[in-house]
From Swiss-Prot:
It comes from Macaca fascicularis. Residues 361-547 are annotated as: Interaction with PSMC2 and SMC1A. Residues 261-403, 458-639 form a coiled coil. Residues 1-74 are annotated as: Disordered. Residues 1-445 are annotated as: Interaction with the N-terminus of CDCA1. GO terms for cellular component: kinetochore; Ndc80 complex; nucleus. The modification N6-acetyllysine is found at residues 53, 59, 527. It is found in: Nucleus; Chromosome, Centromere, Kinetochore. Keywords: Acetylation, Cell cycle, Cell division, Centromere, Chromosome, Coiled coil, Kinetochore, Mitosis, Nucleus, Phosphoprotein. Gene3D superfamilies: 6.10.250.1950, Ncd80 complex, Ncd80 subunit. Its main location: nucleus. Residues 1-250 are annotated as: Nuclear localization. This is Kinetochore protein NDC80 homolog. The lineage of its organism: Eukaryota, Metazoa, Chordata, Craniata, Vertebrata.
C-alpha cells in the first residue's frame, strides 16, 4: 500500500543557504492571554483572565537557539501574495462545494447547503469554524467575545500563510470577504485531512529497514537520506554553511548499500560523456539550422499536396480511360454493323447482276425502257420538289403551332402556379370561394377552346381583386394606426429610460454621499482615538513626574529631618496643590472624554437624520431595496461603534 507524502506548510526548507532569521519571540503551545480593549468614557474593569485551551498546531520554538551566519538574513515578515484565483467564481464555487461536502459527510449538526454557503452570517461562520477546529482540538470552545481576534490568531498559529483581518470577521458574507474566508476554511479542511492521515498511517520505517514504500508521486522513503538531512539541518542551525563531511559519509554509505563497482562507474561516466557530446553535437546542429523542423514540415506539406494532385490526376486518367473504353466498344459495334450491311449489299448486287445476266430484252426495248425511265425520273423529281416545298410549309406551320402551344402552356403553367400560391385552385381551396379557376387546355377542341374560360375565370377573379384591394386598404389603415401607436410606445419607452437613468444617477449620488459620510465618521473615530491616546500618554507622563517629585521629596525628608518642623507647613501646602492639580487634570480628562462621546453621538444622529431625509423620497422599488440595505449597514456600523 502506498503512503501519501505530506508536506507541511512552514517546516519545510527550500534552500540550504537561506532563511537565516529566527523568531525568538514565537509562542509555545499555549495561546496568549486575552487583552483588555479600552472603552470610551468608562472606567476599565479588570476581568479575570482564564487560560485558553492548548493548540495542537501552535508556533514552534527553535531548539538550538539563535543562529549566526555570514550569508545574510531574510525577514519572515514579507507579505506573501495569494496565488489562488479568489476572483474566479468557478474556483469559489468549487471551494464552497468542498466545504459543504465535508460538513455533510462528517455529521455537521446544522442544516447546510450550497445556497446557504453563498453568503453566510457571522453566527453560521463561527459554528462552522468551531466544528472544523474541533477535529484538531476536540476540547476547544470559541469564546463569547473577541472572536474577531481569536479566529485570525488560530489560523496564524496553524501556519496559514495569508493574513485574515479583524474587520473581515464582521462582514463574513460580503462579496469581497467571503472568498478569502472560504479559501481559508478549505485550507483548514486540508489540514484536518492531513492530520487524520498522519494519525492513521503507519511508521515510515521499521527497525533495520533503510528503504520505505513508494509514495503516490514516485518518491522512495529513504531512512539513510532522512538521517543525512537531519544531520545537515542540525549542523546548519548550529552555524555551519558547508556539509562536505556529511556528503562524504553519505556517499560511502550509499556505495556500501548499493554495492557500487568502480569499474562500472567509470564505464557509466564514459557513456555519460559520450551522451553529453552527442547532445552538444545535436544542440550545435539545431543552432546551425534552427528552422529545420519548420522546413521539414513545409516540405511534408508540399509533398502531401503533390500526392493529392497526383491522386486527382490518376483519378482523371482512370475516368478518361473508362470513357475511351466505352467509345472503343461503341466503335467495335459500329464496325460489326457496317460489315454486316456491306455483306448484305454485296449479296443484293450479286442477285441483281444475276437478274441482269438472265434477262431477254432487245436493244430497242432497252432504249424505250430507258426513255420511259428518264421521263418517269423527271416526273418523280418534279413531284419530289413539290413534296419538299409542301413538307417545308407543313414544317413551318407545325413549328409555329408548337411555339404557340408552348407559349400558351407556359402562360397556363405560370397562371396555375400563381393560382396555387394564392390558394385559388383546386376548387375547394381557401380563397376560391367555390369557383373553379383551373383552365384546361385542349388544342384538339379547336381555336375556341379557351373562350368559355373568360366568363368562368375573369368575372370571379375581378370580384376577388376588388375584395382584396379593400382588405389591403383596411390593413394599410390598421398598419398606419399601429405605427402611430408604436411611435407613442417608443416615446414612452424613451421617457422611461430617461427617468430610469435619472433615478440611477440619483441613487449613485446617494451612494457616494453615504460612502462619504461613512468615511467622515471613520476619520472622526480615528481622530478621537488618537486624541484619547495622547491624553493617556499625557496622564502617564504626569503620574511619572509626580512619582519622581514625591521620591525626591521623601529623600529630602530623610536628609533634613531636623528641619521637618520648619518646612512641614510648606510640604503640606505643596502636597495639597499637587492633589488639586491631579484632580483637576482627571476632571478635564473625564470632561473631554464625555464631550468626545457626545460629539460622536451627535455625528451618528446627524448621519442617521441625513440618511432618513435622503431615503424619504419615493423614487422606485429598487431605491427602497437599496435603502433597506443601507439601513442594515448603518445599524451594523452603529452597533460596532457602540
Amino acid at each position: 500500500m502506498k503512503r501519501s507524502s505530506v508536506s507541511t506548510g512552514g517546516a519545510g526548507r527550500l534552500s540550504m543557504q537561506e532563511l537565516r532569521s529566527q523568531d525568538v519571540n514565537k509562542q509555545g503551545l499555549y495561546t496568549p492571554q486575552t487583552k483588555e480593549r479600552p472603552t470610551f468614557g468608562k472606567l476599565s474593569i479588570n476581568k479575570p483572565t482564564s487560560e485558553r485551551k492548548v493548540s495542537l498546531f501552535g508556533k514552534r520554538t527553535s531548539g538550538h537557539g539563535s543562529r549566526n551566519s555570514q550569508l545574510g538574513i531574510f525577514s519572515s515578515s514579507e507579505k506573501i501574495k495569494d496565488p489562488r484565483p479568489l476572483n474566479d467564481k468557478a474556483f469559489i464555487q468549487q471551494c464552497i462545494r468542498q466545504l459543504c461536502e465535508f460538513l455533510t459527510e462528517n455529521g455537521y449538526a446544522h442544516n447546510v447547503s450550497m445556497k446557504s454557503l453563498q453568503a453566510p452570517s457571522v453566527k453560521d461562520f463561527l459554528k462552522i469554524f468551531t466544528f472544523l477546529y474541533g477535529f484538531l482540538c476536540p476540547s476547544y470552545e470559541l469564546p463569547d467575545t473577541k472572536f474577531e481576534e481569536e479566529v485570525p490568531r488560530i489560523f496564524k498559529d496553524l501556519g496559514y500563510p495569508f493574513a485574515l483581518s479583524k474587520s473581515s470577521m464582521y462582514t463574513v458574507g460580503a462579496p469581497h470577504t467571503w472568498p478569502h474566508i472560504v479559501a481559508a476554511l478549505v485550507w483548514l479542511i486540508d489540514c484536518i485531512k492531513i492530520h487524520t492521515a498522519m494519525k492513521e498511517s503507519s511508521p515510515l520505517f521499521d527497525d533495520g529497514q533503510p528503504w520505505g514504500e513508494e509514495t503516490e508521486d514516485g518518491i522512495m522513503h529513504n531512512k539513510l537520506f532522512l538521517d543525512y538531512t537531519i544531520k545537515c539541518y542540525e549542523s546548519f542551525m548550529s552555524g555551519a554553511d558547508s556539509f562536505d563531511e556529511m556528503n562524504a559519509e553519505l556517499q560511502s554509505k550509499l556505495k556500501d548499500l548499493f554495492n557500487v563497482d568502480a569499474f562500472k562507474l567509470e564505464s557509466l561516466e564514459a557513456k555519460n560523456r559520450a551522451l553529453n557530446e552527442q547532445i552538444a553535437r545535436l544542440e550545435q546542429e539545431r543552432e546551425k539550422e534552427p528552422n529545420r523542423l519548420e522546413s521539414l514540415r513545409k516540405l511534408k506539406a508540399s509533398l502531401q499536396g503533390d500526392v493529392q494532385k497526383y491522386q486527382a490526376y490518376m483519378s482523371n486518367l482512370e475516368s478518361h480511360s473508362a470513357i475511351l473504353d466505352q467509345k472503343l466498344n461503341g466503335l467495335n459495334e459500329e464496325i460489326a454493323r457496317v460489315e454486316l450491311e456491306c455483306e448484305t449489299i454485296k449479296q443484293e448486287n450479286t442477285r441483281l447482276q444475276n437478274i441482269i445476266d438472265n434477262q431477254k430484252y432487245s436493244v430497242a426495248d432497252i432504249e424505250r425502257i430507258n426513255h420511259e425511265r428518264n421521263e418517269l425520273q423527271q416526273t418523280i423529281n418534279k413531284l419530289t420538289k413539290d413534296l419538299e416545298a409542301e413538307q417545308q410549309k407543313l414544317w413551318n406551320e407545325e413549328l409555329k403551332y408548337a411555339r404557340g402551344k408552348e407559349a400558351i402552356e407556359t402562360q397556363l403553367a405560370e397562371y396555375h402556379k400563381l393560382a396555387r400560391k394564392l390558394k385559388l385552385i383546386p376548387k375547394g381551396a381557401e380563397n376560391s370561394k367555390g369557383y373553379d379557376f383551373e383552365i384546361k387546355f385542349n388544342p384538339e377542341a379547336g381555336a375556341n377552346c379557351l373562350v368559355k374560360y373568360r366568363a368562368q375565370v375573369y368575372v370571379p377573379l375581378k370580384e376577388l381583386l376588388n375584395e382584396t384591394e379593400e382588405e389591403i386598404n383596411k390593413a394599410r389603415n390598421k398598419k398606419m394606426g399601429l405605427e402611430d401607436t408604436l411611435e407613442q410606445l417608443n416615446a414612452m419607452i424613451t421617457e422611461s429610460k430617461r427617468s430610469v437613468r435619472t433615478l440611477k444617477e440619483e441613487v449613485q449620488k446617494l451612494d457616494d454621499l453615504y460612502q462619504q459620510k461613512i468615511k467622515e465618521a471613520e476619520e472622526e473615530d480615528e481622530k478621537c482615538a488618537s486624541e484619547l491616546e495622547s491624553l493617556e500618554k499625557h496622564k502617564h507622563l504626569l503620574e511619572s513626574t509626580v512619582n519622581q517629585g514625591l521620591s525626591e521629596a521623601m529623600n529630602e525628608l530623610d536628609a533634613v529631618q531636623r528641619e521637618y518642623q520648619l518646612v512641614v507647613q510648606t510640604t503640606t501646602e505643596e502636597r495639597r496643590k499637587v492633589g488639586n492639580n491631579l484632580q483637576r487634570l482627571l476632571e478635564m480628562v473625564a470632561t473631554h472624554v464625555g464631550s468626545v462621546e457626545k460629539h460622536l453621538e451627535e455625528q451618528i444622529a446627524k448621519a442617521d437624520r441625513e440618511y432618513e431625509e435622503c431615503m424619504s423620497e419615493d423614487l422606485s422599488e429598487n431605491i427602497k431595496e437599496i435603502r433597506d440595505k443601507y439601513e442594515k449597514k448603518a445599524a451594523l456600523i452603529k452597533s460596532s461603534g457602540e
